[in-house]
């Protein structure tokens, strides 16, 4: 779903905001449906990622999801993008900022965190920071959610997105950029579940 404001967007067809794609779909509504159809299949090809998690891990997830549709899948974007009042990380800083965050993440011991509230706040902080990176031209949220599912599985937790309203998720992402991770943490409190609780 191409809803970004972009400067000099070579990812799109000339005089259009529709992303260039392998099926040569020029209509945004049809492309949105194609994305849903394709990713509903390709998501099942993604194997569980293992530590250490890096930018390459996220790129691989994105590639698996979208390479059927986009030639640039798994590649860090080289243009500036924004959505609403949110301006995402400038291309020149994406790799260095991603490396900084992944290095910090590697030092966390969420499997040793007994306080579920504290865990959810920590996860929310990282999620919001990674979300600001938005390293790809499209498909950032879908790839990032899968990455965090894998990270949390290794820490002994499962993420259940069931019952999560799209409007609440969007509001938490916007708040994560504008004011902090509190709204995201409040959502995660209900959707991050210890595996031992889910499977006694």
Give the ranges of each region predicted by the language model.
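FIC/Doc superfamily catalytic core
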Residues: 1-200
């Amino acid at each position: 779903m191409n809803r970004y404001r972009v400067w000099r967007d070579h990812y799109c067809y000339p005089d259009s905001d529709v992303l260039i794609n392998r099926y040569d779909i020029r209509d945004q509504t049809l492309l949105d449906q194609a994305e849903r159809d394709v990713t509903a299949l390709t998501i099942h090809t993604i194997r569980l990622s293992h530590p250490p998690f890096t930018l390459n891990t996220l790129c691989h997830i994105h590639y698996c999801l979208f390479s059927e549709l986009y030639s640039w899948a798994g590649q860090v974007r080289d243009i500036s993008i924004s959505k609403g009042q949110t301006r995402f990380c400038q291309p020149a800083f994406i790799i260095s900022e991603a490396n900084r965050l992944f290095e910090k993440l590697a030092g966390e011991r969420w499997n040793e965190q007994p306080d579920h509230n504290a865990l959810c706040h920590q996860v929310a902080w990282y999620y919001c920071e990674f979300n600001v990176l938005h390293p790809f031209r499209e498909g950032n949220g879908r790839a990032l959610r899968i990455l965090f599912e894998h990270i949390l599985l290794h820490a002994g937790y499962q993420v259940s997105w069931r019952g999560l309203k799209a409007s609440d998720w969007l509001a938490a992402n916007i708040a994560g950029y504008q004011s902090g991770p509190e709204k995201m943490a409040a959502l995660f409190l209900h959707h991050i579940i210890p595996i031992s609780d889910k499977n006694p």
